[in-house]
C-alpha cells in the first residue's frame, strides 16, 4: 500500500487501467501489475516520457489512493499467474504498441494497406438505441495506455457502440472519403474496449450511404486468439508494415530481467522523422480548425450495454461497483456542472459537430459530455463501473441539453468567432474551429459552403505548426459523439475561449523547452516534441490534477495548457489555475486545436519540407540562445577547428581529408596518454615523455601538411615503439607479476586500416605491427617471468578495452561507409552521365556493339536488346561510311589520335538519314580495352548553319538596301528639286486662279514626297549606323515654341486644344541635340493630331532626375484620341508598319515616325514609353538626358520666374527685363476658357511669376466672382486685373458688374485659325497655346518680342553643318535651311518642311491675323545657328559687310535673337501655301512695331521679305525711346486717305492685303507720323530710333517726294554704332533712287521708298511684288549724291542698276517712295549726269579695246576653230551711257559679240529720263530689265561661273536662275568635262554636283585643286580670289558629308533640292561680292 502511494500519476493511471483489466481478464491484470512494478523503478522516466498517456488526476481526491493501493496489491498477487503467457503476449504487445505509437506518425501506409480490403470484414452499423459504455474520462486511448495489452484477449473486450470512438487521438489524420470502406476508419480506439458488441462495431465516421455495405463479422466472445481481437487491431496488424520505415524501425523493448515489455513512452523519437505529407490540412476549406480530438479526447466509459457483453461474474461485479459509486458520482456531477457554468463554458471541448445526416444518433452537448465523462472518470478511479443511462434516454437528454447550450452560446460565439479565429496563430494547444466547418463526414470535414474533402488530394494539405504559432499540424478526423456520450462534438459557434490564449502560449513555450532539454516541468510530455501531434498525448481533461505533476497535461484545456495532474483523478475546480497560477478558464479548449492558421493559403508541402520547417523554425530560437551557443555551438566549432586540417594542407582526396581528422584526433589522444603516463608512471616517465613532443609535432604536421600516409606511419610507429619499450622496461626493471596489463597491440592494429585506406600500405603496416607484437609475445614468453592471459578478470580493464575498440571501430565503420557511399556515388554519376548524355555513346569491339546508351536508342530508333540479341549488330549498319574502318588491317585507324571528327550520314532503323558527327575514343570496359564512339546528331546544327547563312544573306541584302538608300539620295532628291524649283519659278509669273490652285498642289505633293524621302533616309542612316548626334546648348522654351508653331494650326483646324505644362524645376538652357529632340517631339505631336478627332493634346515637360552633370527631362504628349489596344502596343515602334490595315488605309504615313523616334531616343541615352487605353487616349513619353550648358549657368524656369518677379538680373539673358507695365501695384490674373487644361496651364505660368490667378469656365462664373469683390478705398493704389479670355464676348463692354475701383486689362487669346482684327475692347492678344513668354510680355515692358525664346544665351553650334544649306533637311517637319529664305516645302498633317520663301498667293490673314506681327523670310535655320558669331567667323574672309535691319519690335536684341524671324525651319515655309500657318500670330506683343531688328550677319541682308506692319493701340505707354503713332494710325479700322504709308500699314486696307501677298524685302520700318526709322544695333543696344527730319504732312504732299537728309541718318547710325563705316566719299545731300540710270557702282547703297498713292489710296501692285525699304548700312564706293530720288508710277518698277546688283536674285522688291523736294531732285540729276559722263568715257575706252581684240581674233581663225563646242562663251560689250549693254550667250564653236545701236540705247535712255517726272511706273520682267538701258543696268558682271550638273532638269533650272541674275556661266555634265573646262578657261566659282557618273564632284575637285597647285589653270577673272571657289551641290546633309566636301577642297556646300533662286544667289554672292 505504501509502495503504491509513492508511485506517480503515471503508475496511478496504470493501476486504474489494471483495475479495469482485472475485472475483465486476470491475465491482463497480471501483465499490468508487472508493468506497474517495473515502472516503480523508473518513476522519473515515466514522469518525463509518458506524461500524455493519462490526463490530469486530482490528487486532492483522497479516496482514490485506497483504490490505487488495492489495485497495486491485486497486481502483485496476479504477477506469477501471467508469467507463462508473457512471451506470446509480449510479441503481440510489441506489435500492438508499435502500431499504436507509430500509426499517427506514419499512418498512411496502414491506410494504404486497406485500400484493397473488402468490406466483408467490416461490422454493420450499431443499433441506434444501443447504450453508451462509460469509461474513464482521463484515458485518451490508445496512446494513453501505458500498459501493453496482450492479444488475443482471453475474453472479448467490450467495444463502444461506435468503433471509431475508441479514442486513438486521430485528430492528426484526415481519411479521404474514398477510403470509407477501409478498416482504418475506426479513428478513435479505446484499448479497454477491444471487443464490443457485434451490433455496435460500425464506425461513426462512416456516412449512412455506406452503412448498408457493411457486414457483421463473426466474433467468438470466448476465444482468446485473433478472433477475439478488435477489428481495428486486426487491420492494424495486417497493415502494410513493410512499407513504413517507421514501423520497421520500431521494436518494443523488454525489461532485462523480467523479460516484459517496457512501456514505450508516447514521446517516441519517431516524431523526428515519421511524419508524412498526408498529415496536412488546407487553411480555410478542407482543414479542421476545430481539431475536435484535442478538445474532446475523453476517455470512453463503459455503458450498460458493454457490461452486458461481459461474463456474468464480471457483469455483476461491475454493476455493484457502479451502484456503490452512484451517489458520489451524482454529487460530483453537480459540482462539475456548476463549476463549468461559472467559468462561462470556456472549458468546453470545441469539436466539429458531426454531420447530422451521417448517423441517426443523438449528439451530446459539450457540457453534458464533460459532466458525464468526469463522472465516469471519478467512478472509474474509485474502482467501480456505473451505467448512467440507457442509449435512448441518454440520446434524448443529450439532444435537449445540446439545444439549450447551443441557444445560450450561439449569439456570443458569433460575435467572438472572428476574433478567436485570428487568435489561432497564438495558440499553443490544439483547439478552435473554422466557421466554414459545420459538420464532419467520413472524410473528416464537411463545410457549410458545400466543401467536400474527398475532392482534395490528401497529399497536399498544408501543415501547420503550433510551436511557433504557425500551423503545421496534420489534419485530423474529428471525434464524433453519435450514440456515445464520451465523444462529444460541438459546433464552433459554441466556442468562446479564444480570447485568453496568452497563458496557453506560455505553457506551449515551456513544453518546447522541456522537449528540447529533456526536462518536463509541470508534467509536460516530451512526446509532443514541438509539433502538432502532441495532441495525441493531450488528455484534455476539464481539470488538472492539483497535487503532483505526475501525468502530463499535454496541452489540456483545463490544465492551463499542459499543466499535469495526478494519476487519473478527476481533479478539483482549483486546478483551473495553471502552473503560473493564471486562470485559464478553459481557453485552451479554443486554441489547443488551432492547427489551421494558414490564412486561406492552400499551399502544400512535401514531407521533407515539413520536417525542415518544423525543426528549423522551432529549434532556431534555442540555437541562438546563449546557453546553446556557449555549450554546444562554440565548443563544437572549437573542436572542429582543432581537428580540421588547415587550408595549407590542401588535400585533393576527400578520403584522405576525412582521415586527416582522425589522425589529428589520434595525436591529441596520444598526447594526453603520454602526458598522463609521464605523470603517473614516475619510474618510466622518460619513456613516455618523448611521445608528448612527438605527438604535438605530428599534430601540427597533420594540420599543415597533406602527407597523411607519412604522418600516420610515424604516429603508429611511435605508439608501437613507446608501448613495446614500456613493456620491456617493465619486464626487466619491475617485480614479476602473474599477469600482463593491457597492451596497445589491438588498438594499433585497428588504427592501421583506419588511417591507411590504401590496401598495400594497410597490409604492410598491419604485418609490421603484428610481427612486432608477436615478437614481443615471444620475448615475454621466453622470459618465463610473465604469461599472457586470454582474458582479463578486471571489469575496468575490460570496459576500457571495449570502449576504445568500439570507438575506433565506429570511426572505421563510419569512414568506410562514407568512402563506400562516395564510390557508389561516383560510379552512379558516371553511369548516369553515360545514360543521360545527349551524345549517342556506343561501345564496340571490332565494330560489334556491346553496349549503348539511351541517346543511341533514341537517335537510331532501336532498343539495346535488339542490338545485342539474337546476334550483335555492327556499327556500320548505322554508320555505313565507317564500314571500311573495320575491315582487316584497318582497325589501327582507331588508334590514330589525329583521326579527329568525322561528319557522315547516319541511318536509323526506319531508314531515315540524317547528318551526324562521329568521334572515336579508347576506353576500358569490364577490364578489356574497347572502342567508344560518340555520335552527335548535327541535323539541328546544319539547319542552324543554313539559317545563319540565310540570316547573313538577309543582312547583306538589308545593308545593300541601306547603302542603296544612302547612295541614291541624290537621285531621290533631284526630281523633287525639279518639281519644287519649277513650281517656284512658275509662281513668279502671272497665273489665273486655276493655275495657282494646281501649282499649289504640285508644291504640296512635292513637299510631302520630300518628307517621305527624309524619313526613309533617316531610317537608312540609323540602320547603317551613320546617324549623328550633335550636342549643343539650346533653350527648351525656344524648342517648344518652334515645335508648337509648326503643328498649332492643324491642331486648331481639327477643333482640338493644345495645352503646355512645364514643371517649374525644368532647366531652361540645356545641352543636347535640339534638332533630334525636336524631331521626336514633332513625330509624337503629328501622330497625336492624326489619331485625335476631339478633345485636346497636352504637352508636359518634367524633370525626372537631376545631378551635377545631367538632367533627365521627360516629354509627355497626351491626347484624347482613339487609343491603342494592349495587344497592339508591341507593334507601335516597328518600322514601316502601323497598327492594322484599317488604320493604314485611313491614316497616311510610312510608319517610320515612331520607329525613328525610338531609335533616336535610344541613341541619345533616353527611352520611349507609351500608355494607352483604347477609346480613351494615349500618352507617348520619352526621356532625354541633357547635359549642363556650356555657355551659361544652369537655371530653372522657377528661378527665371522668381528673378523676373524680383527684378533681378538673369544669367544667360543679355537684356534686362523691363519694368512692370502696371506699376508697383499688385496684379491678379484671370483666365476664362472653356477648356480646363488651358486654364490650368496659364495659371501655372502665373504661379511661376508669383502672381495669383483665378480661372473660370464661362461668363457666368466670372461675373459671380466679380460680384464678390469688395469695394476698396480710392486713395490706395487700385488693384490691377489682367483678364485673359478666349471668349470674345467676354470683354470690358459686355461684362456686367465690373467694379469701377479697379483697373482691367483685357487680353484676347485666340486660335491661330481665327482671322479677325483686334477688337477695340481688347488691348492685346496672343495666339493659342499660351506660353510663358506670352504671359511675361503681357505683364512686363520687355525689350524683345522673343525675349524668352531668343534671348536665352544662344549657344554656338558645334559644327556649322548646315551653313548656307538650302533645301530640305532629314528631319520630318523640318524645313529647308535656306539662308536667303527661299524654297520652303510643306508636308501633310503638320509634318511639312519649312524654310520657304514668301508666297505671293498667301493672303495676309494666312500669314498673320495679329496686328503686331513682323515676319521675315527664313534666311537661316535658327536651330542650326544658335550663335550668329559662328557664321561670322566662317565668313570672316568677306570683310565688313552690310548689316540687315530685321523687323522686330524692340531695341537691344541679343545676338541669338537677330534672326528669329528668319527661322522658318520650325514651320512650313511662307512660300508654301499649305503650311503658312506657322507665321500666323507668330509674335504677339503690346508695343507698336516701329523698330528694326539689326542683324549682324554679314550675308543675311539680301531680300528679306516682310509683311507691312499692322499697328494697334499699345496697352501701355512706351517711354524707351520708341515713338508712338498718332491718332490717325492708332485705329486700324479707319483707313487714311491722306497718307500712303498709313494706307499701306492699315490692316483693313486692300493695299495692305496686296502688300502681304507679295514677297517683300525689309530693312527698317518708317513711320511717317513720327518721322522715325527704328533701328536696333546688336553691337550697341543703345540705339533705339533714327529720327528723320520733320516735314509737314498733308494730302497735298502725296504727289511729291519727302526729303530725307541722309547725312543726318548716317550721323545717327554712327553715333550709336561704332562699327558702322561709310565710304570714303560722303554725300552732301541724300539722293533717292529713281528709274533713271545711275552711274553709281554696284555696291552703292540705296534707299527705296514706297510710292504714295492717289487720292483714292489705292496702289496697283504686281502680284509678285511688294514695297521694300532698304537703309544702307555701308557704302563700298561712290557717294550718296549718286542716289536718285524715287518717284511714283502706276506700277512699281524694280530697278536693276549697279547699286542694286546684289539684289538681282530677288524679284520681290517693292519700291516704297519717300517724298523729296524738287531741289533735291535737280541736285541728284546733276550728280547723275556727271556720273554718266564718267561712265561713257570708260565705256568708250572699253569698246576700243574690244575692237582691237576682235581684229586680233580675226587674224587667228585657227584658234577660234579650236574652241570646244560645249563651252559657252559670253562676251560683254562696253557701251556708252546712252547705249544698252547686252550680254549674249551662245553654245556654238564661235562667240558672236552682240551690240545694240547707239540710237536705240539713246532712245531708251531718253525715255527713261522722261519717266522720272511721271507719277506712275511701268512693270517689266526680269529679261526685259536686263535688256534695258544703262538706267536699268547696275554694272558689268565679269564673274564667270561653271555649272557642273548631270541632271538636265537641274541644268535648265540653274541656268535660268543664273541667266536671270546676269551671271556668265558655262555648263559641264560630269567631272571629266569640268576638269577640261577649268583647263581651258578661267572661272570665279564652280557649282559642283557631288554625285555624278564617270567622275564625281569629289574627284573633280581634287583634280582641280591639283591643277591649281601646279599653276596649270588660269586665275579667276574677277581677281577677287586667288583661287577658284567651288561650291558643292549635294543631296546629303550629314556632318560627315559636309566635312568631306571641305576636306577635298570645296569651299562651301548647298543641299539639294534648291527650291528658290534666292538660295543659289545668296551662295554666289557670299563668295563673289
From Swiss-Prot:
GO terms for molecular function: ATP binding; phosphorelay sensor kinase activity. It is a multi-pass membrane protein. Residues 56-65 have a biased composition (Basic and acidic residues). Residues 11-55, 280-292, 313-335, 574-598, 1399-1410, 1527-1549, 1755-1774, 1781-1821 have a biased composition (Low complexity). It is found in: Membrane. Gene3D superfamilies: 1.10.287.130, 3.40.50.2300, Histidine kinase-like ATPase, C-terminal domain, PAS domain. Keywords: ATP-binding, Developmental protein, Kinase, Membrane, Nucleotide-binding, Phosphoprotein, Transferase, Transmembrane, Transmembrane helix. Residues 1840-1967 form the Response regulatory domain. Residues 1-10, 242-252, 293-304, 469-492, 1554-1563, 1626-1665 have a biased composition (Polar residues). CDD domains: HATPase_EvgS-ArcB-TorS-like (cd16922), HisKA (cd00082), REC_hyHK_CKI1_RcsC-like (cd17546). GO terms for biological process: cytokinin-activated signaling pathway; regulation of spore germination; sorocarp morphogenesis. SMART domains: HATPase_c, HisKA, REC. SUPFAM superfamilies: ATPase domain of HSP90 chaperone/DNA topoisomerase II/histidine kinase (SSF55874), CheY-like (SSF52172), Homodimeric domain of signal transducing histidine kinase (SSF47384), PYP-like sensor domain (PAS domain) (SSF55785). Its main location: membrane. The chain crosses the membrane at residues 660-680, 684-704, 708-728, 747-767, 795-815. Residues 967-1188 form the Histidine kinase domain. InterPro entries: 2C_system_His_kinase, CheY-like_superfamily, HATPase_C_sf, His_kinase_dom, HisK_dim/P_dom, HisK_dim/P_sf, PAS, PAS-like_dom_sf. It catalyses: ATP + protein L-histidine = ADP + protein N-phospho-L-histidine. Acts in the cytokinin signal transduction pathway that regulates spore germination. Required for the maintenance of spore dormancy. Does not appear to act as a cytokinin receptor. Probably undergoes ATP-dependent autophosphorylation at a conserved histidine residue in the kinase core, which is followed by transfer of the phosphoryl group to a conserved aspartate residue in the receiver domain. This is Hybrid signal transduction histidine kinase B. The gene is dhkB.
Amino acid at each position: 500500500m505504501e509502495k503504491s502511494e509513492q508511485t506517480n500519476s503515471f503508475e496511478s493511471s496504470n493501476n486504474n487501467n489494471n483495475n479495469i483489466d482485472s475485472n475483465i481478464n486476470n491475465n491482463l491484470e497480471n501483465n499490468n501489475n508487472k508493468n506497474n512494478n517495473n515502472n516503480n523503478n523508473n518513476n522519473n522516466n515515466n514522469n518525463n516520457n509518458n506524461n500524455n498517456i493519462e490526463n490530469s488526476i486530482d490528487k486532492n481526491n483522497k479516496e482514490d489512493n485506497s483504490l490505487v493501493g488495492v489495485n497495486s496489491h491485486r497486481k502483485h498477487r496476479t504477477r506469477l499467474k501471467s508469467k507463462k503467457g508473457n512471451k506470446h503476449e509480449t510479441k503481440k504487445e510489441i506489435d500492438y504498441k508499435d502500431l499504436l505509437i507509430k500509426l499517427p506518425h506514419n499512418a498512411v501506409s496502414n491506410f494504404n494497406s486497406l485500400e484493397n480490403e473488402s468490406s466483408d470484414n467490416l461490422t454493420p452499423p450499431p443499433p441506434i438505441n444501443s447504450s453508451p459504455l462509460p469509461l474513464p474520462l482521463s484515458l485518451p486511448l490508445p496512446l494513453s495506455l501505458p500498459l501493453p495489452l496482450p492479444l488475443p484477449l482471453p475474453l472479448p473486450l467490450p467495444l463502444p457502440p461506435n468503433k471509431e470512438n475508441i479514442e486513438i487521438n486521430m485528430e492528426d489524420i484526415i481519411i479521404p472519403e474514398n477510403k470509407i470502406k477501409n478498416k482504418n476508419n475506426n479513428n478513435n480506439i479505446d484499448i479497454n474496449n477491444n471487443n464490443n458488441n457485434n451490433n455496435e462495431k460500425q464506425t461513426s465516421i462512416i456516412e449512412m450511404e455506406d452503412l448498408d455495405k457493411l457486414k457483421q463479422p463473426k466474433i467468438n466472445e470466448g476465444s482468446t486468439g485473433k478472433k477475439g481481437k478488435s477489428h481495428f487491431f486486426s487491420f492494424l496488424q495486417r497493415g502494410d508494415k513493410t512499407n513504413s520505415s517507421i514501423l520497421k524501425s520500431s521494436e518494443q523493448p523488454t525489461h532485462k530481467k523480467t523479460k516484459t515489455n517496457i512501456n514505450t513512452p508516447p514521446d517516441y523519437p519517431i516524431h523526428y522523422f515519421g511524419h508524412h505529407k498526408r498529415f496536412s490540412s488546407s487553411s480555410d476549406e478542407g482543414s479542421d480548425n476545430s481539431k475536435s480530438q484535442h478538445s474532446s479526447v475523453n476517455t470512453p466509459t463503459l455503458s450498460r450495454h458493454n457490461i452486458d457483453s461481459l461474463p456474468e461474474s464480471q457483469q455483476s461485479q461491475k454493476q455493484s461497483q457502479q451502484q456503490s459509486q452512484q451517489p458520489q458520482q451524482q454529487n460530483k456531477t453537480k459540482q462539475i456542472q456548476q463549476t463549468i457554468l461559472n467559468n462561462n463554458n470556456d472549458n468546453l471541448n470545441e469539436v466539429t459537430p458531426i454531420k447530422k445526416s451521417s448517423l441517426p444518433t443523438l449528439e451530446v452537448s459539450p457540457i453534458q459530455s464533460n459532466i458525464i465523462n468526469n463522472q465516469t472518470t471519478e467512478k472509474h478511479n474509485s474502482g467501480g463501473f456505473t451505467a448512467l443511462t440507457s442509449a435512448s434516454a441518454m440520446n434524448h437528454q443529450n439532444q435537449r441539453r445540446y439545444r439549450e447550450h447551443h441557444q445560450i452560446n450561439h449569439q456570443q460565439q458569433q460575435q467572438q468567432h472572428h476574433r478567436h479565429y485570428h487568435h489561432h496563430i497564438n495558440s499553443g494547444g490544439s483547439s478552435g474551429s473554422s466557421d466554414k466547418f459545420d459538420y464532419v463526414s467520413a472524410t473528416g470535414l464537411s463545410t457549410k459552403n458545400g466543401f467536400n474533402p474527398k475532392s482534395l488530394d490528401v497529399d497536399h494539405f498544408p501543415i501547420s505548426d503550433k510551436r511557433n504559432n504557425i500551423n503545421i499540424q496534420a489534419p485530423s478526423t474529428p471525434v464524433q459523439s453519435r450514440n456515445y456520450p464520451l465523444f462529444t462534438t460541438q459546433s464552433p459557434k459554441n466556442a468562446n475561449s479564444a480570447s485568453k490564449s496568452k497563458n496557453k502560449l506560455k505553457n506551449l513555450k515551456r513544453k518546447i523547452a522541456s522537449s528540447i532539454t529533456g526536462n518536463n516541468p509541470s508534467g509536460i510530455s516530451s512526446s509532443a516534441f514541438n509539433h502538432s501531434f502532441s495532441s495525441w498525448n493531450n488528455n484534455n481533461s476539464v481539470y488538472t490534477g492539483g497535487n503532483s505533476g505526475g501525468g502530463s497535461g499535454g496541452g489540456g484545456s483545463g490544465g492551463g495548457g499542459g499543466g499535469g495532474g495526478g494519476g487519473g483523478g478527476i481533479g478539483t475546480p482549483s486546478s483551473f489555475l495553471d502552473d503560473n497560477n493564471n486562470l485559464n478558464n478553459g481557453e485552451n479548449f479554443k486554441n489547443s486545436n488551432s492547427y489551421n492558421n494558414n490564412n486561406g493559403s492552400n499551399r502544400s508541402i512535401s514531407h521533407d519540407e515539413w520536417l525542415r520547417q518544423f525543426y528549423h523554425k522551432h529549434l532556431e530560437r534555442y540555437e541562438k540562445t546563449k546557453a546553446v551557443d556557449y555549450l554546444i555551438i562554440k565548443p563544437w566549432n572549437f573542436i572542429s577547428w582543432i581537428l580540421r586540417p588547415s587550408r595549407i594542407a590542401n588535400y585533393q582526396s576527400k578520403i584522405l581529408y576525412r582521415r586527416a581528422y582522425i589522425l589529428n584526433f589520434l595525436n591529441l589522444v596520444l598526447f594526453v596518454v603520454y602526458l598522463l603516463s609521464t605523470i603517473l608512471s614516475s619510474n618510466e616517465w622518460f619513456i613516455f615523455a618523448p611521445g608528448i613532443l612527438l605527438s604535438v609535432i605530428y599534430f601540427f604536421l597533420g594540420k599543415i601538411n597533406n602527407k597523411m600516409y607519412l604522418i600516420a606511419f610515424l604516429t603508429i610507429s611511435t605508439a608501437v615503439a613507446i608501448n613495446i619499450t614500456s613493456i620491456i622496461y617493465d619486464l626487466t626493471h619491475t617485480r614479476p607479476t602473474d599477469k600482463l596489463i593491457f597492451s596497445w597491440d589491438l588498438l594499433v592494429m585497428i588504427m592501421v586500416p583506419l588511417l591507411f585506406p590504401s590496401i598495400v600500405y594497410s597490409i604492410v603496416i598491419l604485418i609490421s605491427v603484428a610481427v612486432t607484437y608477436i615478437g614481443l609475445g615471444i620475448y615475454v614468453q621466453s622470459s618465463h617471468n610473465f604469461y599472457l592471459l586470454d582474458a582479463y578478470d578486471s571489469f575496468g580493464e575490460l570496459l576500457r578495452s571495449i570502449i576504445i575498440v568500439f570507438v575506433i571501430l565506429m570511426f572505421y565503420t563510419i569512414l568506410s561507409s562514407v568512402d563506400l557511399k562516395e564510390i557508389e556515388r561516383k560510379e552512379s554519376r558516371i553511369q548516369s552521365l553515360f545514360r543521360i548524355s545527349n551524345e549517342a555513346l556506343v561501345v564496340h569491339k571490332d565494330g560489334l556493339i556491346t553496349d549503348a546508351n539511351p541517346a543511341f536508342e533514341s537517335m537510331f530508333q532501336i532498343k539495346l536488346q535488339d542490338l545485342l540479341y539474337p546476334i550483335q549488330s555492327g556499327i556500320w549498319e548505322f554508320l555505313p561510311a565507317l564500314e571500311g574502318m573495320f575491315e582487316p588491317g584497318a582497325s589501327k585507324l582507331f588508334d590514330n589520335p589525329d583521326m579527329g571528327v568525322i561528319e557522315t550520314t547516319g541511318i536509323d532503323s526506319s531508314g531515315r538519314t540524317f547528318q551526324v558527327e562521329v568521334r572515336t575514343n579508347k576506353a576500358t570496359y569490364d577490364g578489356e580495352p574497347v572502342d567508344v564512339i560518340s555520335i552527335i546528331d548535327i541535323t539541328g546544327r546544319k539547319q542552324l548553319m543554313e539559317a545563319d547563312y540565310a540570316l547573313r544573306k538577309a543582312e547583306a541584302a538589308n545593308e545593300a538596301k541601306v547603302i542603296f538608300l544612302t547612295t541614291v539620295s541624290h537621285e531621290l532628291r533631284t526630281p523633287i528639286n525639279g518639281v519644287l524649283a519649277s513650281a517656284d519659278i512658275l509662281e513668279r509669273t502671272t497665273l489665273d486662279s486655276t493655275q495657282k490652285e494646281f501649282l499649289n498642289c504640285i508644291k504640296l505633293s512635292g513637299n510631302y514626297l520630300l518628307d517621305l524621302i527624309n524619313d526613309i533616309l533617316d531610317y537608312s542612316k540609323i540602320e547603317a549606323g551613320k546617324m549623328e548626334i550633335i550636342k549643343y546648348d539650346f533653350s527648351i522654351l525656344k524648342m517648344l515654341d518652334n515645335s508648337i508653331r509648326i503643328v498649332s494650326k492643324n491642331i486648331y483646324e481639327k477643333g482640338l486644344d493644345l495645352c503646355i505644362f512645364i514643371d517649374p524645376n525644368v532647366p531652361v538652357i540645356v545641352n543636347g541635340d535640339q534638332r533630334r529632340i525636336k524631331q521626336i517631339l514633332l513625330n509624337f505631336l503629328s501622330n497625336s493630331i492624326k489619331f485625335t478627332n476631339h478633345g485636346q493634346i497636352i504637352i508636359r515637360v518634367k524633370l525626372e532626375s537631376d545631378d551635377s552633370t545631367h538632367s533627365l527631362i521627360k516629354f509627355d504628349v497626351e491626347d484624347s484620341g482613339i487609343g491603342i489596344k494592349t495587344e497592339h502596343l508591341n507593334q507601335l515602334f516597328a518600322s514601316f508598319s502601323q497598327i492594322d490595315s484599317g488604320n493604314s488605309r485611313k491614316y497616311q504615313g510610312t510608319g517610320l515616325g515612331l520607329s525613328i523616334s525610338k531609335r533616336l531616343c535610344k541613341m541619345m541615352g533616353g527611352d520611349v514609353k507609351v500608355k494607352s487605353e483604347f477609346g480613351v487616349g494615349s500618352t507617348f513619353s520619352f526621356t532625354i538626358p541633357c547635359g549642363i550648358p556650356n555657355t551659361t549657368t544652369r537655371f530653372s524656369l522657377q528661378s527665371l520666374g522668381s528673378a523676373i518677379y524680383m527684378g533681378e538680373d538673369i544669367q544667360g539673358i543679355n537684356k534686362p527685363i523691363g519694368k512692370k507695365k502696371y506699376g508697383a501695384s499688385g496684379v491678379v490674373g484671370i483666365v476664362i476658357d472653356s477648356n480646363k487644361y488651358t486654364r490650368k496651364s496659364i495659371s501655372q505660368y502665373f504661379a511661376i511669376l508669383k502672381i495669383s490667378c483665378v480661372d473660370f469656365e464661362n461668363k457666368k462664373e466670372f461675373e459671380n466672382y466679380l460680384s464678390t469683390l469688395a469695394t476698396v478705398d480710392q486713395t490706395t493704389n487700385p488693384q490691377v486685373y489682367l483678364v485673359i479670355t478666349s471668349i470674345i464676348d467676354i470683354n470690358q463692354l459686355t461684362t456686367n458688374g465690373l467694379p469701377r475701383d479697379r483697373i482691367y486689362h483685357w487680353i484676347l487669346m485666340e486660335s491661330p485659325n481665327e482671322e479677325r482684327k483686334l477688337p477695340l475692347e481688347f488691348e492685346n492678344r496672343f495666339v493659342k497655346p499660351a506660353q510663358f513668354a506670352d504671359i511675361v510680355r503681357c505683364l512686363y515692358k520687355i525689350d524683345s518680342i522673343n525675349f524668352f525664346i531668343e534671348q536665352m544665351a544662344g549657344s554656338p553650334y558645334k559644327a556649322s553643318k548646315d551653313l548656307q544649306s538650302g533645301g530640305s533637311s532629314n528631319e520630318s517637319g523640318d524645313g529647308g535651311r535656306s539662308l536667303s529664305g527661299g524654297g520652303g516645302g510643306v508636308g501633310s498633317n503638320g509634318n511639312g518642311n519649312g524654310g520657304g520663301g514668301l508666297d505671293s498667293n498667301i493672303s495676309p490673314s494666312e500669314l498673320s491675323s495679329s496686328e503686331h506681327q513682323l515676319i521675315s523670310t527664313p534666311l537661316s535655320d535658327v536651330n542650326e545657328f544658335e550663335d550668329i558669331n559662328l557664321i561670322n567667323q566662317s565668313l570672316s574672309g568677306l570683310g565688313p559687310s552690310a548689316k540687315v535691319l530685321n523687323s522686330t519690335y524692340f531695341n537691344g536684341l541679343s545676338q541669338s535673337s537677330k534672326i528669329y524671324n528668319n527661322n522658318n525651319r520650325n514651320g512650313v515655309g511662307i512660300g508654301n501655301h499649305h503650311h503658312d500657318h506657322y507665321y500666323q500670330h507668330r509674335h504677339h506683343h503690346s508695343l507698336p512695331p516701329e523698330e528694326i531688328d539689326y542683324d549682324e550677319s554679314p550675308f543675311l541682308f539680301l531680300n528679306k521679305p516682310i509683311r507691312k506692319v499692322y499697328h494697334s493701340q499699345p496697352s501701355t505707354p512706351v517711354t524707351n525711346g520708341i515713338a508712338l503713332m498718332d491718332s490717325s494710325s492708332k485705329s486700324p479700322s479707319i483707313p487714311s486717305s491722306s497718307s500712303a504709308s498709313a494706307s499701306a500699314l492699315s490692316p483693313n486696307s486692300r493695299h495692305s492685303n496686296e502688300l502681304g501677298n507679295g514677297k517683300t524685302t525689309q530693312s527698317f520700318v518708317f513711320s511717317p507720323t513720327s518721322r522715325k526709322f527704328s533701328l536696333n544695333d546688336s553691337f550697341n543696344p543703345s540705339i533705339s530710333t533714327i529720327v528723320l527730319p520733320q516735314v509737314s504732312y498733308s494730302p497735298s504732299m502725296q504727289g511729291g517726294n519727302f526729303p530725307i537728309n541722309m547725312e543726318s541718318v548716317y550721323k545717327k547710325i554712327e553715333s550709336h554704332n561704332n562699327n558702322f563705316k561709310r565710304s570714303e566719299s560722303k554725300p552732301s545731300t541724300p539722293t533717292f533712287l529713281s528709274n533713271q540710270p545711275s552711274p553709281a557702282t554696284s555696291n552703292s547703297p540705296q534707299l527705296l521708298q514706297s510710292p504714295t498713292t492717289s487720292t483714292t489710296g489705292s496702289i496697283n501692285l504686281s502680284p509678285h511684288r511688294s514695297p521694300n525699304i532698304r537703309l544702307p548700312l555701308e557704302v563700298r564706293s561712290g557717294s550718296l549724291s549718286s542716289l536718285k530720288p524715287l518717284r511714283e508710277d502706276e506700277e512699281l518698277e524694280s530697278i536693276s542698276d549697279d547699286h542694286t546688283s546684289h539684289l538681282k536674285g530677288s524679284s520681290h522688291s517693292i519700291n516704297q517712295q519717300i517724298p523729296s523736294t524738287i531741289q533735291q531732285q535737280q541736285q541728284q540729276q546733276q550728280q547723275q549726269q556727271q556720273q554718266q559722263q564718267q561712265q561713257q568715257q570708260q565705256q568708250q575706252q572699253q569698246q576700243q579695246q574690244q575692237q582691237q581684240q576682235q581684229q586680233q581674233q580675226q587674224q587667228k581663225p585657227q584658234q577660234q576653230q579650236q574652241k570646244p563646242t560645249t563651252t559657252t562663251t559670253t562676251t560683254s560689250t562696253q557701251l556708252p551711257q546712252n547705249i544698252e549693254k547686252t550680254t549674249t550667250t551662245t553654245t556654238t564653236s564661235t562667240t558672236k559679240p552682240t551690240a545694240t545701236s547707239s540710237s536705240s540705247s539713246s532712245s531708251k535712255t531718253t525715255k527713261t529720263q522722261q519717266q522720272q517726272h511721271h507719277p506712275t511706273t511701268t512693270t517689266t520682267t526680269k529679261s526685259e530689265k536686263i535688256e534695258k538701258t544703262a538706267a536699268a543696268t547696275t554694272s558689268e558682271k565679269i564673274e564667270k561661273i561653271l555649272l557642273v550638273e548631270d541632271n538636265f532638269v537641274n541644268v535648265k533650272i540653274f541656268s535660268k536662275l543664273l541667266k536671270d541674275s546676269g551671271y556668265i556661266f558655262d555648263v559641264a555634265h560630269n567631272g571629266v568635262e569640268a576638269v577640261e573646262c577649268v583647263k581651258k578657261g578661267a572661272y570665279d566659282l564652280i557649282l559642283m554636283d557631288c554625285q555624278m557618273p564617270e567622275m564625281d564632284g569629289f574627284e573633280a575637285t581634287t583634280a582641280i585643286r591639283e591643277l591649281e597647285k601646279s599653276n596649270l589653270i588660269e586665275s579667276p577673272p574677277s581677281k577677287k580670289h586667288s583661287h577658284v571657289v567651288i561650291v558643292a551641290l549635294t543631296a546629303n546633309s550629314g556632318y560627315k558629308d559636309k566635312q568631306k566636301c571641305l576636306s577635298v577642297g570645296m569651299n562651301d556646300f548647298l543641299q539639294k533640292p534648291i527650291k528658290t533662286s534666292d538660295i543659289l544667289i545668296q551662295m554666289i554672292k557670299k563668295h563673289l561680292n
